[in-house]
From Swiss-Prot:
<feature type="active site" description="Electrophile">
    <location>
        <position position="95"/>
    </location>
</feature>
<keyword id="KW-0963">Cytoplasm</keyword>
<dbReference type="InterPro" id="IPR035990">
    <property type="entry name" value="TIM_sf"/>
</dbReference>
<keyword id="KW-0324">Glycolysis</keyword>
<comment type="similarity">
    <text>Belongs to the triosephosphate isomerase family.</text>
</comment>
<comment type="function">
    <text>Involved in the gluconeogenesis. Catalyzes stereospecifically the conversion of dihydroxyacetone phosphate (DHAP) to D-glyceraldehyde-3-phosphate (G3P).</text>
</comment>
<feature type="binding site">
    <location>
        <position position="173"/>
    </location>
    <ligand>
        <name>substrate</name>
    </ligand>
</feature>
<protein>
    <recommendedName>
        <fullName>Triosephosphate isomerase</fullName>
        <ecNumber>5.3.1.1</ecNumber>
    </recommendedName>
</protein>
<keyword id="KW-0413">Isomerase</keyword>
<feature type="binding site">
    <location>
        <begin position="233"/>
        <end position="234"/>
    </location>
    <ligand>
        <name>substrate</name>
    </ligand>
</feature>
<feature type="binding site">
    <location>
        <position position="212"/>
    </location>
    <ligand>
        <name>substrate</name>
    </ligand>
</feature>
<dbReference type="GO" id="GO:0004807">
    <property type="term" value="F:triose-phosphate isomerase activity"/>
</dbReference>
<keyword id="KW-0312">Gluconeogenesis</keyword>
<dbReference type="InterPro" id="IPR013785">
    <property type="entry name" value="Aldolase_TIM"/>
</dbReference>
<comment type="pathway">
    <text>Carbohydrate degradation; glycolysis; D-glyceraldehyde 3-phosphate from glycerone phosphate: step 1/1.</text>
</comment>
<feature type="active site" description="Proton acceptor">
    <location>
        <position position="167"/>
    </location>
</feature>
<dbReference type="GO" id="GO:0006094">
    <property type="term" value="P:gluconeogenesis"/>
</dbReference>
Length: 251
């Protein structure tokens, strides 16, 4: 049975003092024992969060890492080896904001996935369609292409040590949420694509839903058979709301 995972993506939010307050709130949460929980703060707060959450059952990850695994001459980037060194356990790759705003291609995303995994980090591969792509009936085609790029480059076995997050771009930061049925359709297609290559890998990989996840909608989403938790954006900046989402995953 797949163990649920709820990961909070703080995006480009926080100051030293506000992060300290959020850490305090997270430490006070009573988290369900059967759920893995992680937060992904901005890079410059990672060490603060790791130290602040020491002893609490919350993993810390990063929102991005470089295409090269080891440190070197790549100004402004952070090597996955450096993230592993400070105590990160996972990293987002291919988030839609980086694909759309910063122009990261499927090829770049695949390279980041490989680099992160080579350093012992768990890549959380983000896939999803824009509103225009959904309205054109291309949702499953787009997601299959994004997932297939990594499979073609690294083989399906790489997903035995990875997580996939489906995040419909039209639902991110908009307040809109895919219905449980819409989300399940895509999650089932992702698992089927993996199963076509390796049934055991497909059975074990955790698939998260991301896209304006709130406590009020979480339980119904997480009740779908192929949804194994959530990649939570804005709601993860509120400790109580985030805790409620984690409890929904445990129910």
């Amino acid at each position: 049975m797949r163990r649920p995972l709820v990961a909070g993506n703080w995006k480009m939010h926080g100051t030293h003092s506000s992060v300290a307050e959020l850490i305090k709130g997270l430490r006070q949460l009573a988290l369900p024992s059967g759920v893995d929980v992680a937060v992904m703060p901005p890079c410059l707060f990672i060490s603060q969060v790791i130290q602040g959450l020491a002893g609490k059952a919350i993993d810390v990850g990063a929102q991005n890492s470089a295409v090269e695994p080891m440190q070197g001459a790549l100004t402004g980037e952070t090597a996955p080896s450096q993230l592993a060194d400070v105590g990160c356990s996972m990293v987002l790759v291919g988030h839609s904001e980086r694909r759309l705003i910063l122009g990261e291609s499927d090829e770049v995303v695949s390279r980041k996935f490989a680099a992160a995994q080579s350093c012992g980090l768990v890549p959380v591969l983000c896939v999803g369609e824009t509103r225009a792509e959904r309205e054109a009936g291309k949702t499953l085609e787009v997601v299959a292409r994004q997932l297939g790029s990594v499979i073609d480059e690294l083989g399906v076995g790489a997903f035995a040590r990875a997580v996939v997050a489906y995040e419909p771009v039209w639902a991110i930061g908009t307040g809109l949420t895919a219905s449980p049925a819409q989300a399940q359709e895509v999650h089932a297609a992702i698992r089927a694509q993996l199963a076509a290559e390796n049934a055991e890998v497909a059975k074990g990989v955790r698939l998260l839903y991301g896209g304006s996840v709130k406590a009020a909608s979480a339980a119904e989403l997480f009740g779908m058979p192929d949804i194994d938790g959530g990649l939570v954006g804005g709601a993860s900046l509120n400790a109580d709301e985030f805790g409620a989402i984690c409890r929904a995953a445990g129910s």
